[in-house]
């Protein structure tokens, strides 16, 4: 199946938080869709270069409204689009157990999304 991936990140974030957001989204994507990570490669002196993604992942600028709207639209197609989000609640936590506990008490409307990653069929992305 022909698949595509995009990330949309809030353009109003500081550069460091934009970089952090894309790193977290990419790591989660690699875990969930391991086949997109290529094999290790070697240069002419046999130095190893670890496998990187085998697909393009364009990163687009958006804002909180656009990210929320795209998230809403993508969630209509759960069998065709994998949605990964990163929000203020996650960024504020010291560890993953704190994230789990806080998320259980949060409403979706209370979250400020920093970025989303959409991976799915070309017709839906």
Question: Residue ranges of each PLM-predicted region?
Answer:
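Positively charged, small/polar-rich N-terminal and surface patches that mediate targeting and assembly
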Residues: 1-125
């Amino acid at each position: 199946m022909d698949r595509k991936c995009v990330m949309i990140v809030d353009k109003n974030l500081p550069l460091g938080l934009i970089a952090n957001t894309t790193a977290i989204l990419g790591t989660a994507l690699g875990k969930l869709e391991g086949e997109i990570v290529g094999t290790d490669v070697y240069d002419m002196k046999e130095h190893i270069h670890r496998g990187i993604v085998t697909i393009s992942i364009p990163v687009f600028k958006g804002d909180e409204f656009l990210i929320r709207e795209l998230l809403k639209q993508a969630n209509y197609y759960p069998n065709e689009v994998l949605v990964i989000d990163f929000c203020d609640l996650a960024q504020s936590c010291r560890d993953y157990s704190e994230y789990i506990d806080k998320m259980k008490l949060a409403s979706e409307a209370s979250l400020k999304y920093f970025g989303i990653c959409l991976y799915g069929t070309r017709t839906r992305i």
